[in-house]
Regions:
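Conserved thiamine diphosphate
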Residues: 1-20, 171
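Thiamine diphosphate
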Residues: 19-172
Length: 172
């Protein structure tokens, strides 16, 4: 399962999955237009990327697809409060990309944000994988509370579900 964050990644991964990959494969991509913050991200062809890493960052903000916009904004908000964080954007979701746990085990805190339900989600899988590799840090998981969902636009839903940048920062 792959979740490109912008049109460039969508084109790249769609071509790769159709022409080179074998077996079942899926792309998860949000409907609607391409957000400017996400459009600015390069398509590296990597299965995950650390976006503009900061020396000494002890916090990793992790997400995928359209929610990447919120972790980028959260990184900027945290920096305004003197907290250095790195953003890790997953493109391959399942199975988790090789090497992602090795990259993340150097952080004290990992906040994973995803716009799906908690149970059985990618964040839950990553939390388990981090535990299995011996990581002893704090894992924070922000997901959708499916006991109530508003009829609202995406920014309103993100705010209600505490998946917007401001809400992500409150746990750090």
């Amino acid at each position: 399962i792959f979740a490109p964050a912008n049109y460039a990644e969508l084109r790249y991964w769609l071509t790769y999955l159709v022409r080179k990959a074998h077996g079942p494969r899926m792309i998860r991509y949000a409907r609607g237009g391409e957000n400017p913050a996400l459009a600015a991200l390069p398509c590296t062809g990597a299965r995950y990327d650390v976006l503009d890493p900061v020396d000494g960052a002890r916090v990793a903000l992790v997400s995928y697809g359209a929610e990447t916009e919120e972790i980028i904004a959260a990184k900027d908000l945290l920096a305004q409060h003197g907290v250095q964080a790195d953003c890790v954007k997953l493109t391959q979701l399942y199975p988790l990309p090789v090497g992602v746990c090795d990259t993340l085990k150097h952080y004290d805190t990992i906040l994973f944000a995803e716009d799906t339900v908690r149970t059985g989600g990618i964040g839950e899988q990553l939390g388990f994988a981090m535990q299995q590799c011996g990581w002893q840090g704090e894992f924070l998981l922000h997901t959708v509370d499916n006991s109530h969902l508003l009829h609202a636009n995406v920014p309103e839903l993100r705010k209600d579900q505490q998946l917007d940048a401001a809400a992500l920062c409150t746990d750090i």
